[in-house]
Curated annotation (Swiss-Prot):
Protein name: Rho-GTPase-activating protein RGD2
CDD domains: DEP_fRgd2 (cd04436), RhoGAP_fRGD2 (cd04399)
Function, as annotated: Acts in signal transduction. Activates CDC42 and RHO5.
PROSITE patterns xrefs: DEP, F_BAR, RHOGAP
Record-linked Pfam families: DEP, FCH, RhoGAP
Lineage, opening ranks: Eukaryota, Fungi, Dikarya, Ascomycota, Saccharomycotina
Note: Present with 1750 molecules/cell in log phase SD medium.
Site positions for Arginine finger: 517
Membrane-spanning ranges: none
Species this chain originates from: Saccharomyces cerevisiae (strain ATCC 204508 / S288c)
Domain (Rho-GAP) ranges: 475-704
Amino acid sequence: MLSFCDYFWSEDLVSGLDVLFDRLYHGCEQCDLFIQLFASRMQFEVSHGRQLFGIEAGMDNLKAVQEDEDEGVTVSRALRGILQEMSQEGTHHLTIASNIESLVLQPFSKWCIEHRERIQYSEKTLLTNVNNFRKSKKYVGKLEKEYFNKCRQLEEFKRTHFNEDELANAMKSLKIQNKYEEDVAREKDHRFFNRIAGIDFDYKTMKETLQLLLTKLPKTDYKLPLISYSLSNTNNGGEITKFLLDHMSLKDIDQAETFGQDLLNLGFLKYCNGVGNTFVNSKKFQYQWKNTAYMFANVPMPGSEEPTTGESLISRFNNWDGSSAKEIIQSKIGNDQGAAKIQAPHISDNERTLFRMMDALAASDKKYYQECFKMDALRCSVEELLIDHLSFMEKCESDRLNAIKKATLDFCSTLGNKISSLRLCIDKMLTLENDIDPTADLLQLLVKYKTGSFKPQAIVYNNYYNPGSFQNFGVDLETRCRLDKKVVPLIISSIFSYMDKIYPDLPNDKVRTSIWTDSVKLSLTHQLRNLLNKQQFHNEGEIFDILSTSKLEPSTIASVVKIYLLELPDPLIPNDVSDILRVLYLDYPPLVETALQNSTSSPENQQDDDNEEGFDTKRIRGLYTTLSSLSKPHIATLDAITTHFYRLIKILKMGENGNEVADEFTVSISQEFANCIIQSKITDDNEIGFKIFYDLLTHKKQIFHELKRQNSKN
């Protein structure tokens, strides 16, 4: 059955959702109209019932009729009886109104309000996440542009300022400079830093001490009095003093307080309670760990993704608030630098500029690389969220239609249970109620308002020098095959080989075929995709190891093939080729359904069979002639896919009811892979993809024999 999850996708994600929610809100308006209908009928029943009750009160001289009735006058008795029946009829109408309100109007109105809230919640959640994703995608595009600009600037600088020999010498100088900086940093770790609480600390020991305080001592947020502002990463004086006594060889509390005071003086701590620069061992005195403490210790700030690295101590301490700490450290580092400059290698101005540009490029590349894969993970999570909410909205819409059906039935029952004279009208209304078909309405919504099939847009990290070398999914087929040094992507061929390996262990043919046709949760597919995406594989064994250790179901492994093909920038059969094939299949349509019929042909059908065979011959000839224009990786990948299923179909035919099972699987796998080989159009439900894949399976030998023959000629 058609599903919301398959037909409300669009390239920007938003336009498909806009169409869907427009129809869902239209459904809410339908519910409001039903509420108006029920309320109007209730008001009519109330008004009509009261009018029937008021007939007796509006008549004159009823007292005389009462006297005549006491005297046994038959006419008066008839009048009294008619009035009583009218009053009884009024009671029935008021009862109907009461039942409509309590049994239909109130519960249905309450349900409609909740239904609208569910739609609003999903709309807000999805649009917020999709819009945030689109903003982040623009940010990644900006990073990509900056990265490529830096690459071009670097290459231009190399071209204009260096020849090949000078560039080689510059690279050697870079290695010498890096080694020199590492040696200086290593030597600096063991130089004297400061005397704290009577203990001499070198740089290394001071870093380790701060790392202990910043990572092992639990931090809290401190809310400043009178204003609604909180400071993060704080401890009170008592906590710091106790931690120092527990973890360091300090004599007593006084020495621990002195240690805390020195941390305050050096600018690692800041007093939070007001103005002052005194450290006190008390729970009432709150202190915040400053950013410079995290920078000095190379510890990531809470909430940041990576530690602060790569800056010299001078640049780090230039931003310190503690002026005394500045003077101490600047003087010591200045002396260290003076000593280091004596042994520093000579670097020209052009080389220095080159190294600076290379550092800037490396930083830009790293940031672009990280954000690219972070965006791809975000894209996967957004798709999973969309799948979940589309399924939820499909259930909500189905529930809405069923709720209208039930409310209509309750409404008709309320009328029919009371007044038999309305039976004919009620029967007609029941007929109308019976004509309500939620499934057909849901199908009509999908067919008329669908925006596109599921086509994930992978976020690709475009490295300037090695495009496609850092991920496997979303890279165009020719690039992937060139990097794999194969004509078929290594992931595709390896998964098919792995499936061939596990087929014998599966209990029966039904399980083997259902692997490729069962629905798989998108999050599980993305989980395995993530394991296979970043690593560059050299042989099938590496992929086999991941597939074996993942302990995922075979159907999940099979789904990765589909997601790989869907994420290709260009489908296996590109759009220009598919347009030609659409015309071909329009002129020579296949009769796929005849493959499922096992009846023998009668003499009167012989002429039709001959016509069909002629159509098939022309269509297949046109198919392999058109496909011959594809590149070698595209043809080889199509061949690998169809070969795998062709062999599986041959195995199925050898089992019990083999031909029937094989024919059913051929149809179902053609439907499953239709969107994987060709990009569908909204109007045709990708019937062309189904027909092409079906022909590739049923005429495989002829088609690929001709394709290989034509390629060998070329």
